[in-house]
Amino acid sequence: MIFYTADLHFLYEPLLSSRPFATVEEMDETLIRNWNETVSPDDTVYLVGDIGYNEGQVPHQLLSRLTGHKHLIRGNHDTGYEDAASLYRYFETITDFNEIDDGETHILLCHYPIIYRKRGYMIHGHIHQSRGQEYQLLKELPRVLNAGVDINFYRPVTLEELIENNRAFYSGEWDDLIPPPPHTPRGDKGWLPATPDFRPIPERPNGQ
């Protein structure tokens, strides 16, 4: 089975203001538990960007606990790790862009949303649960799907689940399913993604 997810942001404390967790440890452990309860060792997961927050070392102790065959489509917070090449320990492929077939459905994968009206679906991350200008645009593009954990119950989801969760988010039904984080007004993102910063993908080390 194929699953999709994005914007985990392991170890990133500022996101607590827009997520329903009291601590980074609670957030990280919930994301890992939800992942492993959903994904079997034989399943495939496309992580559409933003493992953590682009600084220091790769979060090895967290990535090593995630099950399944994993593929990373890099986000703007996946390019600045001091040991970025070590990501190949956990991901079978690392790209900035990918195209796959999920059954008979064609899928375009990129961290940033792309206007897409062709066959299949475009799956992205980056915008979290933002209700900014992009919300009004993307709600008119039902083939462009947000895989971010913030609107997908903090777990990887299938294409069918992704379609339904996005429909609920852009129709307003999602607001009744997931309450806003404490001290955050409903519909207020509280944090805006950084400007995209593309850097070369590190070469796969010999032997990995």
Predicted regions span which residues?
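Acidic, histidine-bearing metal-coordination/catalytic regions of metal-dependent phosphoesterases
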Residues: 1-22, 41, 146-208
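Core catalytic region of metal-dependent phosphoesterases/phosphodiesterases
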Residues: 3-101
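Residue-identity detector for glutamine
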Residues: 57, 61, 129, 133-136, ...
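Conserved beta-sheet core of the metallophosphoesterase superfamily
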Residues: 87-179, 184
